[in-house]
Structure formats: C-alpha cells, structure tokens
Amino acid sequence: MKRILITGGAGFIGHHFVVHLLKYTDWEIVVLDRLNYASTGFDRLRDIKVFDGNRVKVFTADFTKPIVEGLAQELGQFDYIVHMGAETHVDNSISNPEPFVIANVVGTMRMLDFARLQSNLTQFVYFSTDEVF
C-alpha cells in the first residue's frame, strides 16, 4: 500500500485533499499539521476519520523546526509528500512578515530535509498560495 504525508492536511484545502484520497485511493494517509488558528481543522479531520479512521493518522507538530529522530521514525517512510502547510492570510504578512517567512520558507526547507531521508519517495509536491500573481 502506498503512503502519503500531507502537511497542512487539517486546513481548508488539505482536508478536501484527504477526503479525495480516501475516496479514490487505498493509500495510508498521514497528516502533519500544527493545528493553529488557520486550521479549525481537527474537527474537519475528526469528521473524516469517522469515515475511515484506519487509513488516516494525524500528527501535531511544527514542521518549521527540524523533525526529530523519534518523530521521523514514528512517521516512517513515504511514497509521496504533499507539502501544503503554510501560514495563511497573506495580507497579514504586510505588517508582520516574520511568521510567514518562518512557516513558508523555513518550513518548506525542513520538509525538503525530511524528504531527503525518504528511501521510497517518488514525488514531492509543493502547494503555493492563491496570493501569487
């Protein structure tokens, strides 16, 4: 069975992606999310897990920090990583850019570091923002 890691899987787009994967694949889905203000999402994921709790595992962690060995072992190996975890509400970055740089730049670097440890990884997908134009 294929395994996929989704950062930001409790967010608005992320949880819809989890639902899509549950419906159209037999993959094991692992969600890594900070569950901060933007993701009222544990409620979203709880509702999904009722649908198929055996295939969805949720880990709460801050991916802007290096993924420690214990968490890396618990997460395991993945065939795919979809990185959509980010600081949202981009208009707030005008007055306070630091959290956005940390989450959106440093967080992506940390996920790429984690991806290098994956011996089975075939694809790393990065979601950007609807504010890029």
Could you describe each region identified by the protein language model?
Residues 1-133:
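N-terminal Rossmann-like NAD(P)+-binding domain of SDR-like oxidoreductases, especially those catalyzing
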